């Protein structure tokens, strides 16, 4: 995770909050390359799920206006919305790895929100997003190895906006998330999963 020093002129800077493109009307959210070129069946599914997206954001933050300058709250909400939107995409768009990247970035932003607003449950929500990222990174690797969903066509594997650690970075992140947020009850199963990611 890349952290930025606050500047005297602009204060705290969070470039991560601007990465997702959000339609302020229907709350469709995605990476820029997926935002403009949507096939009609996907657009119809996204439109049908519009109210679910409104409810999801309202449940976390209340009302967020995506017509104004992005805030930390709006940035975190945008990654959550992208997670919901990529559920409706076909496998040729590699939605699982994109959801994994969004879940990890959402975890980072919710963690920052938790530091700024400790009275809220953002730290707990951050841990949930880390666990979701673990599941999605693991699932993306499974789908890649079985040939059901390719991730090699992605321009940037992230995880941050200015770093591209490639396919090896995906494997590394999966192992790191497994180590930090994977189940800890069954040690044999835990060691087996970590060994698979070597």
Language-model-detected regions and their locations in the chain:
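Charged, long alpha-helical assembly modules
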Residues: 118-198
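Amphipathic alpha-helical repeat scaffolds of TPR domains
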Residues: 49-83, 92-118, 131, 138, ...
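Short coil/linker segments at helix-helix boundaries
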Residues: 1-7, 40-60, 116-133, 185-195
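Aromatic-enriched hydrophobic runs in primary sequence
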Residues: 17-18, 37-40, 46-51, 71, ...
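N-terminal cysteine/histidine-rich coordination modules
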Residues: 1-50
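A short, hydrophobic/aromatic-rich structural module that often spans a beta strand
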Residues: 29-55, 161, 166-174, 192-197
């Amino acid at each position: 995770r890349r952290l930025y020093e606050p500047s005297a002129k602009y204060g705290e800077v969070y470039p991560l909050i601007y990465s997702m493109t959000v339609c302020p009307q229907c709350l469709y959210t995605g990476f820029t390359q997926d935002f403009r070129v949507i096939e009609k069946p996907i657009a119809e599914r996204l439109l049908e799920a519009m109210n679910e997206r409104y409810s999801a954001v309202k449940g976390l933050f209340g009302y967020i206006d995506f017509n104004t300058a992005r805030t930390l709250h709006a940035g975190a909400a945008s990654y959550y919305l992208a997670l919901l939107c990529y559920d409706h995409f076909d496998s040729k768009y590699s939605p699982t790895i994109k959801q994994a990247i969004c879940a990890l970035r959402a975890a980072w932003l919710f963690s920052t929100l938790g530091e700024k607003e400790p009275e809220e449950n953002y730290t707990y929500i951050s841990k949930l997003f880390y666990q979701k990222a673990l599941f999605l990174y693991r699932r993306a690797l499974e789908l890649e190895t079985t040939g059901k969903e390719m991730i090699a066509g992605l321009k940037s594997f992230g995880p941050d906006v200015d770093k591209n650690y490639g396919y090896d970075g995906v494997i590394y992140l999966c192992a790191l998330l497994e180590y930090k947020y994977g189940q800890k009850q069954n040690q044999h199963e835990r060691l087996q999963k970590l060994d698979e990611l070597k």
